């Protein structure tokens, strides 16, 4: 038997051991991989086994070969998870893109709607302007025809308005002048108002317009809308002229017979009475118009006219009921005529230097207010016609309304 060298036996032994070790490593790696796939929660293990390495010269030297099983397992798990996650990711992405596109598309749509509405409104205004421009000659022609048809009523209305403005201005000026007012001017305004009223009724005597002053119907036959408007307008102005004439008569009364303070309350009461009268005097005219308009023959039209007339009466009653508080307050002030203070003593007058702060003259009938400031009775009465506080310290003296105490008359036309 021929003996082999020692190094050959050693090399063959090492090669056998290397093969066995390699098989063992491959078997353990496959077992560990199957174990990782079966359980996702198992911790990763890093397994290092010594593997002999051969040198390039043919001599074998033993070295360590490290195989990282955890990295391979983690890569395999990550790949499997990525396969599971991808469908859900792709499933959500269209919805996100859909929401984004919907929000992006809603903005331009709203802007387009606004621009369309704005352009439509501008075009409508432009078409209206073009229509008015084309229709202006026709409107002018028919307006001229209406003016010619109602030239009498328009002329009378302008004349009555001018008369009212002139008389009202004269009365207010004379009330402001007090003792220095011109009696001749007051008499002239009174005569002017009477002459204007009689001239108007005499000119249209065939229509018997003066009947409406006493809540009767004038003789106009079938009453149309413009006829009712004509009667109510004239009656309203003539009623104002009547009460303005009464104010002129009060102005003619000497101050030693009626004080200026009392005259102020009379002006206020007359104006309140004039407004109530003008509110009521138009009721019979419009009631007749609502019933008799168009010579109603059928029963349905007659019943409809009665219904409208009843509604008109209800509205008129509501208006009168709304003015009830104002009228009652005015009547209470007229009857009581409250004082603004007490008669001032000589000491109070001397403390005020014996001179009224309003008229800058010596006191005449001095009155001491609740704030102890002293003024002339007539001066402080004129002051309280428009104010409610003391002229010096602005202390509230009176809560009452003193409107119309300056002799003015309301221009408001109570047509209905």
Curated annotation (Swiss-Prot):
SMART domains named in the record: RING
GO CC terms, sorted: endoplasmic reticulum; endoplasmic reticulum membrane
This protein's pathway: Protein modification; protein ubiquitination
Top-level division of the source organism's lineage: Eukaryota
Group of enzyme by EC: transferase
Biased composition (Polar residues): 20-45, 68-80
Region spans: Required for ubiquitin ligase activity and for protection against ER stress-induced cell death: 349-400
InterPro entries per UniProt: RNFT1/2 (IPR044235), Znf_RING (IPR001841), Znf_RING/FYVE/PHD (IPR013083), Znf_RING_CS (IPR017907)
ZnF endpoints (RING-type): 356-394
Biological process, per Gene Ontology: positive regulation of ERAD pathway; protein ubiquitination
Ranges of compositional bias, category Basic and acidic residues: 7-19
GO molecular function: ubiquitin protein ligase activity; zinc ion binding
Annotated stretches, region: Disordered: 1-50, 68-117
Keywords: Endoplasmic reticulum, Membrane, Metal-binding, Transferase, Transmembrane, Transmembrane helix, Ubl conjugation pathway, Zinc, Zinc-finger
Subcellular localization(s) per the UniProt record: Endoplasmic reticulum membrane
Catalytic activity: S-ubiquitinyl-[E2 ubiquitin-conjugating enzyme]-L-cysteine + [acceptor protein]-L-lysine = [E2 ubiquitin-conjugating enzyme]-L-cysteine + N(6)-ubiquitinyl-[acceptor protein]-L-lysine
Annotated Basic residues bias: 81-100
EC numbers for this chain: 2.3.2.27
Residue intervals passing through the bilayer: 146-166, 184-204, 214-234, 237-257, 265-287, 302-322
Membrane topology classification: Multi-pass membrane protein
PROSITE patterns per UniProt: ZF_RING_1 (PS00518), ZF_RING_2 (PS50089)
Record's function text: E3 ubiquitin-protein ligase that acts in the endoplasmic reticulum (ER)-associated degradation (ERAD) pathway, which targets misfolded proteins that accumulate in the endoplasmic reticulum (ER) for ubiquitination and subsequent proteasome-mediated degradation. Protects cells from ER stress-induced apoptosis.
Name this protein carries in UniProt: E3 ubiquitin-protein ligase RNFT1
Gene (UniProt): rnft1
């Amino acid at each position: 038997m021929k003996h082999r060298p020692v190094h050959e036996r050693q090399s063959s032994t090492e090669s056998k051991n290397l093969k066995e070790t390699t098989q063992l490593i491959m078997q353990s790696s496959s077992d560990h991989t199957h174990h990782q796939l079966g359980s996702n929660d198992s911790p990763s293990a890093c397994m290092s086994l010594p593997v002999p390495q051969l040198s390039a010269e043919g001599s074998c030297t033993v070295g360590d070969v490290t195989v990282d099983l955890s990295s391979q397992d983690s890569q395999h798990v990550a790949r499997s998870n990525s396969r599971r996650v991808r469908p859900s990711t792709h499933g959500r992405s269209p919805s996100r893109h859909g929401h984004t596109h919907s929000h992006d598309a809603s903005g331009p749509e709203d802007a387009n709607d606004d621009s369309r509405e704005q352009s439509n409104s501008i075009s409508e205004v432009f078409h209206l302007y073009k229509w008015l421009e084309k229709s202006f000659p026709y409107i002018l022609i028919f307006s001229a025809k209406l003016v010619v048809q109602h030239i009498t009523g328009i002329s009378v209305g302008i004349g009555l308005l001018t008369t009212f403005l002139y008389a009202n201005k004269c009365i207010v000026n004379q009330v402001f002048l007090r003792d220095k007012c011109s009696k001749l001017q007051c008499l002239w305004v009174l005569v002017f108002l009477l002459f204007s009223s009689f001239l108007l009724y005499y000119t249209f005597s065939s229509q018997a317009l003066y009947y409406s002053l006493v809540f009767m119907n004038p003789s106009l036959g079938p009453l149309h809308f413009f006829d009712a408007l004509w009667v109510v307008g004239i009656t309203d102005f003539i009623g104002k002229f009547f009460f303005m004439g009464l104010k002129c008569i009060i102005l003619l009364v000497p101050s030693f017979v009626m004080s200026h303070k009392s005259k102020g309350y009379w002006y206020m009461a007359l104006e309140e009475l004039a407004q109530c009268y003008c509110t009521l005097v138009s009721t019979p005219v419009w009631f007749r118009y609502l019933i008799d308009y168009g010579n109603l023959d059928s029963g349905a039209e007659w019943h409809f006219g009665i219904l409208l007339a009843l509604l008109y009466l209800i509205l008129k009653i509501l208006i009168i009921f709304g003015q009830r508080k104002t009228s009652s307050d005015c009547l209470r002030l007229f009857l009581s005529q409250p004082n603004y203070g007490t008669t001032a003593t000589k000491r109070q007058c001397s403390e005020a230097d014996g001179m009224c702060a309003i008229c800058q003259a010596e006191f005449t009938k001095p009155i001491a207010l609740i704030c102890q400031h002293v003024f002339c009775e007539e001066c402080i009465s004129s002051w309280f016609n428009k104010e409610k506080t003391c002229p010096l310290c602005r202390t509230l003296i009176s809560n009452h309304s003193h409107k119309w105490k300056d002799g003015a008359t309301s221009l408001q036309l109570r047509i209905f």
